[in-house]
């Protein structure tokens, strides 16, 4: 299937790119998510005319996303959860939990699909989580999962001492 991207797609292309993709990928993902349109003759002509408008719109979106990135950068999200004796959570911390808490902290709606987790968080500790705000821009957030506020503070102190030790080594 031949498509034209109308939004940038990570690891695929930028606005206005004409690509051949698998039929299922185009029909089931790119077209319904309004990331692309079919590459018909009329659409190709239309895209050539509107490419500058799309690029200007993308720059505007990117500038807005960079502002959000500065708000997100260096955020530390603390989750207090019940655990078993061996620090395993009863349940897990999911990308939706992280998106909800982050949205509340920065007063901007972050979708759970923007939160990139390799797997759900199922034990206490400190985790780094990637937030994909734009096809080319990601932010890193620290997630702390603990049994109590005091344990979360201990994790924070431990992380600060590790960071200061890393800085001393690099100098």
Curated annotation (Swiss-Prot):
InterPro entries: Ribosomal_bL9, Ribosomal_bL9/RNase_H1_N, Ribosomal_bL9_bac/chp, Ribosomal_bL9_C, Ribosomal_bL9_C_sf, Ribosomal_bL9_N, Ribosomal_bL9_N_sf. One of its GO terms (molecular function) is structural constituent of ribosome. Keywords: Ribonucleoprotein, Ribosomal protein, RNA-binding, rRNA-binding. GO terms for cellular component: ribonucleoprotein complex; ribosome. GO terms for biological process: translation. Binds to the 23S rRNA. Belongs to the bacterial ribosomal protein bL9 family. This is Large ribosomal subunit protein bL9. The gene is rplI.
């Amino acid at each position: 299937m031949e498509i034209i991207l109308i939004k940038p797609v990570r690891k695929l292309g930028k606005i206005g790119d004409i690509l051949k993709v698998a039929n299922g990928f185009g029909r089931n993902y790119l077209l319904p998510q309004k990331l692309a349109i079919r590459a018909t003759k009329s659409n190709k002509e239309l895209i050539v005319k509107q490419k500058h408008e799309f690029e200007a719109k993308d720059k505007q979106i990117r500038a807005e996303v960079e502002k959000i990135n500065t708000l997100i950068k260096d955020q530390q999200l603390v989750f207090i959860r019940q655990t078993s004796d061996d620090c395993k959570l009863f349940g897990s911390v999911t990308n939706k939990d992280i998106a909800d808490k982050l949205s509340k902290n920065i007063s901007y709606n972050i979708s759970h699909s923007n939160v990139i987790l390799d797997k759900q968080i199922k034990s206490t500790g400190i985790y780094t989580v990637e937030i994909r705000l734009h096809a080319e821009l990601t932010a890193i957030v620290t997630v702390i999962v603990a049994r109590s506020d005091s344990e979360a503070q201990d994790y924070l102190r431990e992380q600060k001492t590790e960071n200061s030790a890393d800085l001393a080594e690099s100098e």
